[in-house]
Amino acid sequence: MKKGKISASMMCAGLDKIFYYLTEFKEANLEFLHIDIMDGDFVPNLALGTDYVKSLRRITNIPFDYHFLVNNPLEKMSWFDIRENDHVAFHYENNKKIKECLEFLKRLGADSYIAINPETDYHFLEPYLNDINGILVMTVHPGFAGKKLVPSTIKKVEDLRKYLDKLGKTDIKIEVDGNITI
């Protein structure tokens, strides 16, 4: 079994303790900071705007794991300082410019992930498998922290891994997001 990586949700990190959290994350060799970008349109919440993310960049060198839960992700990705080796996920469900998003992220040197909601069939992603580094599977219905885990998503992740392996896509990573507490 492959070793997993942990990405801490900055949406859940209280601003009043941000330096404490970042110090703890650094000491624990945390691989990524999970940055949820929400526009209040694709999901019924607003989270982590450009100024907040710019400030985070100034105070930490931990790579970012962006998750764009927005309409028109191609436009909104350009608002952020996405760097080489950052992970960037955008949703399949509302995106008519998937190829353009993947090309944009490739030019930046970022790892491209396509995110899917609990009810979305992962087979829809097959046309993009040669162009992505990973698939982000939502294990909750997105929008707010603390939502209840959708139990069927655990099997979905297992089935997705088998599907990718069967296609010879063993290099494609699977990221899970939602109500994962350790």
Task: Outline where the language-model segments fall.
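Active-site/ligand-binding-proximal alpha/beta "capping" segment
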Residues: 141, 148-182
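Short glycine/serine/threonine-biased micro-segments
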Residues: 38, 47, 141-144, 176
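Histidine/lysine/aspartate-rich catalytic loop segments that bind and position anionic ligands
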Residues: 116-153, 159
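Conserved N-terminal beta1-alpha1 strand-loop-helix module at the mouth
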Residues: 1-87, 95-97, 104-106, 112, ...
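Short, flexible active-site-adjacent loop segments at beta-strand->alpha-helix junctions, enriched
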Residues: 72, 94, 116-120, 141, ...
